[in-house]
Amino acid sequence: MIEFGVHSEVGKLRKVIVCRPGLAHSRLTPGNAAQLLYDDVLWVQQARTDHMDFCMKMESRGIKVLEFGQLLEETVRDKGARNWILDRRINENQVGVGMLNELRSWLDDMSAEQLAIYLIGGISVHELPFKPHGMFGNYLGGDGFVIPPLPNTQFPRDNSSWIYNGVTVNPMFWPARRPETLLVTAVYRFHPEFAPAFNNGDFKIWWGDPDLDHGPATAEGGDVMAWGNGSVLIGMGERTSPQAVGQIAKRLFEQGAATRVIACQMPRSRSAMHLDTVFSHCDRDVVTAFTDVCDEIQCYTLRPGDHAGQIDFRKEKKHLFQLAADCLGIKKLNVVQTGGDHYQKEREQWDDGNNVIALEPGVVVAYDRNTYTNTLLRKAGVEVITVSGAELGRGRGGGHCMTCPVWRDPVSY
């Protein structure tokens, strides 16, 4: 059995990637949090405890949970994989010329466990086994990072997107996140969990390459939903560009992987950075949505054209909710709106009330703090499993953001 492929948003979830908070989050400060795309610093110990609870609740449902730091450690045990990463991460463009050879030699000899910790957590000048020197070394000062930390690996949804029987490795919008794509690509290419299937053609990389400059064609997985029945929803807001959507659609159509892409043009805002921050699938016909944003989304339908490489494009008059229902072959969706009065709705959307992960049809994991929205979901027949979001949510992501499904069943309608 091929244990890869995501064929819906709510079918039985069987295998998922997560990334627990760690060293990168310990390096967050009030001074650098915004640059690293966090709104606040975390109580890291509590965040790790809450993340473990999240993982255990998925495992209790029979889901195989793969921790990204562990995957990376197991990947860099392979000398070829280690070289592949370091050739791209430790070069003149990244660390200058003065310390390049010493830094590379140190990392070449490092244990796989410590190297994986540093690749995600970053390396400060204090941790170097030699005195910083050269232009770059002196520029960093006493508290700079030779390799910046990657705290947003907590949200592995974004750096790659499994779409039916393949995956995109996404060129991300903000520089603070772009190295994530290199690391996840290495895992898919070299890790024993993935490499045999990749080499056998059991799954394909549809689009994206960390060796290429994609320019303004940026994409992040929080905008990408393998909706089912050959359809894909892709948000276009703060992080995912129309150039990327067009390229992804073209590759999917060329490979026969999808028959329709619904591009969803969203307002560009921090609170609605991805489609999944305002819209999540919870049950066969149930979604939760922040309608203040969803009602403003302009949708476009892309389909394969009559000739090779051609895409038919149509600006839609229908609402996102109706198009999503049409893709599933059902009359309409039961839309559970963000709960509470005007103020509470805005607060709960900000706290990821509409960013839930379905473990199977009608069962989701949500943050405990979003009591109004969770109550409405339960009234709609959805089982809501809660985890604490007080610390984990400080990076603006809920259960949907904190998971990258790699194997999920289809749903029949």
Curated annotation (Swiss-Prot):
Active site: residue positions: 401 (amidino-cysteine intermediate)
Keywords: Arginine metabolism, Cytoplasm, Hydrolase
EC number: 3.5.3.6
Subcellular location: Cytoplasm
Highest taxon above the source species: Bacteria
GO molecular function: arginine deiminase activity
Pfam families in alphabetical order: ADI
InterPro entries, sorted: Arg_deiminase
Major localization class: cytoplasm
Catalytic activity field: L-arginine + H2O = L-citrulline + NH4(+)
Pathway linked to the protein: Amino-acid degradation; L-arginine degradation via ADI pathway; carbamoyl phosphate from L-arginine: step 1/2
One term under GO cellular component: cytoplasm
Family: Belongs to the arginine deiminase family.
Stated name of the protein: Arginine deiminase
Species this chain originates from: Marinomonas sp. (strain MWYL1)
Gene coding for it: arcA
